[in-house]
């Protein structure tokens, strides 16, 4: 038997709609953000896969405690099923990454990853850690903790029962348990200690339940003196939802796994077993003994005196009345020493000032994609829908290139539109950063500065400088593409950098039962207008492929199908078939995959 596999190098486009739509918070949502502003505490939830996370507890931490909350999923779920489409393995991991981001957008958490690959079911954590490369994944867990700097770490799974469940599950808990003692030691994984600083969380907890005890009856009889218990069924009037309803909305984002969930209301208790660190005196408070007030920042007491009273004086009819106090707090915070919470709260203050002011900023490209180093027209909309005096003083690219330095006073409810010509500095096409380089069965490869990020940063970003009450704010916005659909109305899409041309073969595996030739169709897509293209197929030694073909693609987006005759060798053989496109002296070998659900 003779077998050919398609060798595909991917340029990936995903319709990450949630990430592209502009935020337009209501007064109630602004109030909720204000509550979060005055809490300086954080929690990191750790498990193995997308859908392993306890969305009820994550939502409770983010919306009830108002803590900065993140879920560290060691893998992207590449080994799971797919209920909604044909994508599996790496492409399923891309889908499940977006599902996790949608879940966090629902429950208020953030999302982190390691480079570990979900290679399928594993019977034992020893097998898992061998395939993953334990030290590499452990270093990623340490990196995540040092970057996020959680006060509390919560494991989803039990680290003490290897072999009793999925090896990935137990391994995630084992790595978190080990990392807790390493992150505070700058000599352990020193590279991330230099970059992000060492850090020591206050406590490590295990999110236990009756399931881990074997039955509800056994759990009722168990000694609970080592457990923290929290009531997670609370109702949030500002959001109009109970915590269980938010959790179900989040859970239902795992659509590829068929995890749609119905909302619940009423009391729901979560239990957390104390594992390491400082035991809380108040076993109903996860953050007991942790300073979560503004005094956590040097000079923060004065800031807290300005911000804490704003919850009582907040005007739901006119949130802009608190803008002067927010700006005053922003100025004071800018004058404090560089630090972890300073950066977080400056960003939150910027978002609140913009939201309370009724400012809308948007940067829209005139086309959905460009080629590397390509040019596009940027359509800017800026409007101040409140009563505060605001000036738009500068617009730059994220790298600092000035696009407009014209000072524009944003008069109340008077829209300003600008058209700016931009040349991208992006030299490579958009794709999932963990798929750019070949990894192993257990580990993806990733640039060091991107390890842990949920997705590749936006291809193009624009910085707006706003001046409010003699205070400059830098507001960063992703460049997006949008259009009007006759059915859906305003539709947003990511703005991507795509190759000039791409090729694909629909059949990823070709089987030759004998020595007879087969016809192979290659689909070529133009990434720009007026291309003269030569296409050839590279095959392993001994295989014979018909001659390269020269053809023209006139319009961007145009697709042409070309047929090649492939003849196998007489003896058994297998290898990779690779489409290669030549334009002038440049060769292209990427396949463009668009995922849109």
Q: Residue spans of the language-model regions?
A:
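Proline-anchored loop/turn motifs at beta-strand termini and strand-loop-strand connectors
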Residues: 383-417, 421-426, 527, 531-556, ...
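Low-complexity, acidic Ser/Thr/Pro/Gly-rich terminal tails and inter-domain linkers that flank the onset
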Residues: 330-373, 400, 482-513
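Short beta-strand elements of extracellular/lumenal beta-sandwich folds
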Residues: 372-387, 515-529
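Short, surface-exposed loop/turn segments at beta-strand-coil junctions that are enriched for proline
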Residues: 421-454, 553-556, 567-573
């Amino acid at each position: 038997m003779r077998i050919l596999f398609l060798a595909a190098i991917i340029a990936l486009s995903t319709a990450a709609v949630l990430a592209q739509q502009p935020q337009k918070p209501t007064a109630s949502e602004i109030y909720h953000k204000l509550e979060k502003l005055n809490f300086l505490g954080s929690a990191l939830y750790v498990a193995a896969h997308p859908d392993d996370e306890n969305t009820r507890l994550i939502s409770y931490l983010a919306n009830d405690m108002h803590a900065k909350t993140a879920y560290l999923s060691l893998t992207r779920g590449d080994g799971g099923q797919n209920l909604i489409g044909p994508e599996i393995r790496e492409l399923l991991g891309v889908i499940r990454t977006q599902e996790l981001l949608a879940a966090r957008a629902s429950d208020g958490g953030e999302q982190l990853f390691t480079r570990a690959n979900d290679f399928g079911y594993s019977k034992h954590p020893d097998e898992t850690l061998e395939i993953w490369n334990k030290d590499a994944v452990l270093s990623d867990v340490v990196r995540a903790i040092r970057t996020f700097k959680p006060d509390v770490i919560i494991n989803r799974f039990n680290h003490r029962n290897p072999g009793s469940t999925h090896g990935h599950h137990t391994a995630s808990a084992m790595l978190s348990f080990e990392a807790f003692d390493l992150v505070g030691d700058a000599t352990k994984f020193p590279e991330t200690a230099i970059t992000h600083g060492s850090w020591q969380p206050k406590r490590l907890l295990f999110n236990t339940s009756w399931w881990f005890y074997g039955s509800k009856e056994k759990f009722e009889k168990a000694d609970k003196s080592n457990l923290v218990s929290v009531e997670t069924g609370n109702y949030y009037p500002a959001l109009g939802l109970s915590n269980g309803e938010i959790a179900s909305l989040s859970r239902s984002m795992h659509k590829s796994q068929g995890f749609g969930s119905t909302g619940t209301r009423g009391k729901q208790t979560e239990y957390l077993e104390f594992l390491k660190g400082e035991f809380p005196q108040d076993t109903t408070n996860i953050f007991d003994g942790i300073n979560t007030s503004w005094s956590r920042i040097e000079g923060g007491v004065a800031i807290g005196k300005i911000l804490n009273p704003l919850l009582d004086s907040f005007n739901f009819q006119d949130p802009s009345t608190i803008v002067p106090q927010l700006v005053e707090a922003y100025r004071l915070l800018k004058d404090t020493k560089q630090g972890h919470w300073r950066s977080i709260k400056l960003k939150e203050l910027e978002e609140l000032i913009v939201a309370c002011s009724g400012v809308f900023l948007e940067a829209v490209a005139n086309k959905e994609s460009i080629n590397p180093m390509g040019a596009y027209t940027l359509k800017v909309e800026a409007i101040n829908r409140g009563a505060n005096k605001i000036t738009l003083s500068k617009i730059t690219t994220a790298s600092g290139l000035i696009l407009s330095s014209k000072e524009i006073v944003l008069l109340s409810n008077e829209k300003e539109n600008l058209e700016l010509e931009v040349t991208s500095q992006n030299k490579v096409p958009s794709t999932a950063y963990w798929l750019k380089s070949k990894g192993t069965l257990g580990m993806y490869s990733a640039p060091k500065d991107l390890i842990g990020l949920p997705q590749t940063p936006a291809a193009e970003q624009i910085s707006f400088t706003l001046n409010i009450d003699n205070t400059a704010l830098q507001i960063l916005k992703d460049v997006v593409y949008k259009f009007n659909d006759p059915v859906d109305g305003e539709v947003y899409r990511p703005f991507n950098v795509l190759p000039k041309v791409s090729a694909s073969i629909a059949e990823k595996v070709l089987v030759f039962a004998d020595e007879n030739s087969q016809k192979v169709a290659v689909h070529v897509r133009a990434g720009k207008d007026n291309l003269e293209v030569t296409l050839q197929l590279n095959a392993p030694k001994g295989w014979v492929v018909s001659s390269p073909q020269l053809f023209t693609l006139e319009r961007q987006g145009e697709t042409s199908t070309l047929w090649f005759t492939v003849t196998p060798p007489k003896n058994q053989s297998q290898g990779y078939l690779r489409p290669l496109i030549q334009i002038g002296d440049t060769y292209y070998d990427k396949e463009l995959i668009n995922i849109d659900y």
